[in-house]
UniProtKB/Swiss-Prot annotation:
The lineage of its organism: Bacteria, Pseudomonadati, Pseudomonadota, Alphaproteobacteria, Hyphomicrobiales. The gene is rhbA. The keyword NADP does not apply. It comes from Rhizobium meliloti (strain 1021) (Ensifer meliloti). It is an enzyme of class 2 (transferase). The keyword NAD does not apply. One of its GO terms (biological process) is rhizobactin 1021 biosynthetic process. Pfam families: Aminotran_3 (PF00202). Its EC number is 2.6.1.76. Transmembrane segments: none annotated. This is Diaminobutyrate--2-oxoglutarate aminotransferase. It comes from the Bacteria.
Length: 470
C-alpha cells in the first residue's frame, strides 16, 4: 500500500473531525437533535436506541458519550463476525491499496470470481452443481424482487404465494409479500396476485389447535388450496418462505412442514424461493436455515452477512430457471468489490473457526438461560428460535387468554423490557405481532461470558417488572 494511502486509511480524521478526540465531539443529544431535524420521519432505530455511535469492536459498540453497549442486534443480523473484525478490515485495506476497481457493474474480477466460488461452496450438493448467481443492488429487498422476476419469467405465470408473518423487504414487490399490514397501510395498490397462507406458528396457532398439529394442518391446507380447481388461486409463479421467520417473531418452521411445502411445489412445478437474508450464513446453527429439513430450494435469496458487513445481495438459483434475456435484471452497485472481498474473508473465517457449529452451541446456552428466566416469570409465553436467532414472546398475564389458553400479546411490556435492557447496556430488537417478541441476533462470535451478561440483564429486567406489578 502506498505510504500516503496507508496514512489516510489509518487516520481517524474525517471531514476535518477527529473521530477519536473527545474534545472534538458533541454529545448524544447534539447528534440526535440534528438527526431528528434533518432525517426522514421513517427512521426507526434511533427512536428506541437514542445514541450516536463512535466506535465498535466485536459485540460491543460505544457512543460519543463513552458508554458501551453489548449489541444483540448486530445490524439486524448482518454482522456475523461482529463489528470491525481485524481480518476483514485488513482485507478491505488490501483491496483499497491494490488498484482494483471498486465499481465494476457486472464485469468480472479475481475478487468476484473467488467470491462466487466461495459462496457456491456453501451450497448443498443438489444445488451447487447446477447453480447460477445474479448479483443485485445491495439490499435484500432487491434480491427478492429479482427472484420474483426470475420465477415469473421462467414460468410465464404471475401469481405469488407468501405466508402470514412474512417479511421480504420494503420495495413494491417485496412489500406485496409482507404479512405485516402496517408498512402497507398508506402505500395503496401493490403488486397484484399475492396470496397468503398460514405459517406454522404453533404458539398462536392459526387453526386454534397448537402443538405439532399446527404444522400438519398448515401443510394440508397449503396442499389442498393449491390443488383445488375451485380454490380461486391460479397456479403461482413461485412460493416464497423463510425457514425461520425473523421480523415476524422468530418463528422456526418445523421440518415436516418445510418438507411438505417442498414436495407440493415440486409436484406442481412451482419454483420454491427461500429467503435466507437474515437466517443464512450460519446464524441458525446450519449455514442455511432450510438445511435442517434436508430440502433443496429452487431459488435462494442472500444478503446481510454475505457481504461481511458491507452491502451485497445475490440470488442463487437452478440453471434451468435462467431464462432471462441479457439485462433483464441489473443494479448499478451490483459490482461492489469491497463487499465481495469482505464476504470471502468472512466465509473463510466462519469455516476456519467453525462458527456455524459455534452458533449452535452458543444458541443452546443462550436459549437455556432464556428458558430459565421464562420459568420464573409470568411475562414470557414462549422462548423459540434456532442457533443465535432467538425470540422471547412477551405476554400480558392479566389479559384474557386466547383459545389455546395463552395470555395476549404484551407489546407494552416488551417495550418496557427493551428500554430496561438498553439502560443496562444491552441492545436488542422487538418484532412479531404487535412488537411483542424480544429478538436476539448477536454476532456469531459472542462469548459465553457475554451470553451470560445478556441473560443476567434480562433476568433482572423481568424481576424488576414483577416487583413493580406486585
Amino acid at each position: 500500500m502506498p505510504a500516503d494511502l496507508a496514512a489516510r486509511t489509518s487516520s481517524k480524521i474525517f471531514n476535518g473531525v477527529d473521530l477519536m478526540d473527545a474534545s472534538a465531539r458533541a454529545d448524544n443529544a447534539f447528534y440526535l437533535d440534528r438527526q431528528e431535524r434533518r432525517e426522514s420521519n421513517a427512521r426507526s432505530y434511533p427512536r428506541r436506541f437514542p445514541v450516536a455511535l463512535k466506535s465498535a469492536s466485536g459485540c460491543i459498540v460505544t457512543d460519543v458519550d463513552g458508554r458501551s453497549y453489548l449489541d444483540c442486534l448486530a445490524g439486524a443480523g448482518t454482522l456475523a463476525l461482529g463489528h470491525n473484525h481485524p481480518e476483514v478490515i485488513e482485507t478491505l485495506q488490501q483491496v483499497l491499496g491494490s488498484g482494483l476497481p471498486l465499481h465494476t457493474l457486472d464485469l468480472t474480477t479475481p475478487v468476484k470470481d473467488r467470491f462466487v466460488s466461495d459462496i457456491f461452496g456453501t451450497l448443498p450438493a443438489g444445488l451447487r452443481d447446477e447453480a447460477k448467481i445474479q448479483f443485485c443492488s445491495p439490499s435484500g429487498t432487491d434480491a427478492v424482487e429479482a427472484a420474483i422476476k426470475l420465477a415469473k419469467t421462467a414460468t410465464g405465470r404471475t401469481d405469488l404465494v407468501s405466508f402470514r408473518g412474512a417479511y421480504h423487504g420494503m420495495s413494491q414487490g417485496s412489500l406485496s409479500l409482507m404479512g405485516s399490514l402496517g408498512p402497507k397501510a398508506s402505500v395503496g395498490q401493490l403488486v397484484p396476485g399475492a396470496h397468503f397462507f398460514p405459517y406454522p406458528y404453533a404458539y398462536r396457532c392459526p387453526f386454534g389447535r397448537g402443538g405439532n398439529e399446527t404444522a400438519t394442518l398448515a401443510a394440508e391446507y397449503f396442499e389442498r388450496a393449491l390443488r383445488d380447481p375451485e380454490g380461486g388461486i391460479n397456479r403461482p409463479a413461485a412460493v416464497i418462505l423463510e425457514a425461520v421467520q425473523g421480523e415476524g417473531g422468530v418463528i422456526p418452521a418445523p421440518v415436516e412442514w418445510l418438507r411438505a411445502v417442498r414436495r407440493v411445489t415440486r409436484d406442481l412445478g412451482i419454483p420454491l424461493i427461500v429467503d435466507e437474508v437474515q437466517s443464512g450464513v450460519g446464524r441458525t446453527g446450519s449455514f442455511y436455515a432450510f438445511q435442517k429439513a434436508g430440502i433443496i430450494p429452487d431459488v435462494v435469496v442472500l444478503s446481510k452477512a454475505i457481504g461481511g458487513g458491507l452491502p451485497l445481495a445475490v440470488v442463487i438459483y437452478r440453471e434451468d430457471l435462467d431464462l432471462w434475456k441479457p439485462g433483464a435484471h441489473a443494479g448499478t452497485f451490483r459490482g461492489n468489490q469491497l463487499a465481495m472481498a469482505a464476504g470471502s474473508k468472512t466465509l473463510e473465517i466462519i469455516e476456519r473457526e467453525r462458527l456455524v457449529e459455534r452458533a449452535a452451541i452458543a444458541g443452546r446456552r443462550l436459549r437455556a438461560n432464556l428458558e430459565r428466566i421464562a420459568a420464573q416469570t409470568p411475562y414470557i409465553g414462549e422462548v423459540r428460535g434456532e442457533g443465535l436467532m432467538l425470540g422471547v414472546e412477551v405476554v400480558d398475564p392479566e389479559g384474557l387468554p386466547d383459545a389455546l389458553g395463552h395470555p395476549p400479546h404484551g407489546q407494552e411490556i416488551a417495550r418496557m423490557i427493551q428500554h430496561e435492557m438498553f439502560r443496562a447496556g444491552i441492545i436488542l430488537e422487538t418484532g412479531g405481532r404487535f412488537g411483542s417478541v424480544l429478538r436476539l441476533l448477536p454476532p456469531l462470535v459472542i462469548s459465553d461470558a457475554e451470553i451470560d451478561q445478556v441473560s443476567g440483564a434480562l433476568a433482572a429486567a423481568f424481576e424488576r417488572l414483577g416487583r413493580k406489578a406486585a
